Amino acid sequence: MINSYPLTENDLVATQKVAEAFGHQFGDNASLAPSPASASEDFSIFGRTWGVPCVFWFVGGTDPAVYAKAKQDKTVNKIPSNHSPKFAPRIHPTLETGLQAMLTAASAWLCPRTTA
């Protein structure tokens, strides 16, 4: 049983590679520079255990109008997140964006862009 998780730290080189790929895919809508966030994620164990670089990112799924109002009211931290029973992302386009993000990140290694 695991009662605690180590800090999740993105690998710098891998993060730069994923950020570049996200920039090509999503343009100005992509950002891998969120504010630090504390969370209990088992994700941080994978890279350490397997000795591989890891990159953890978030995919926003809140209705843009709800987010804009929360930002205006300075209550963004009260928007329910993924472990809350009140979590209610907009399924579309959230699911499509999440899939595109995963495929884009994987493709950065599996199908790297080449320059002539």
Describe every region a protein language model picked out.
Residues 1-116:
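Metal-dependent amide/peptide-bond hydrolase catalytic core
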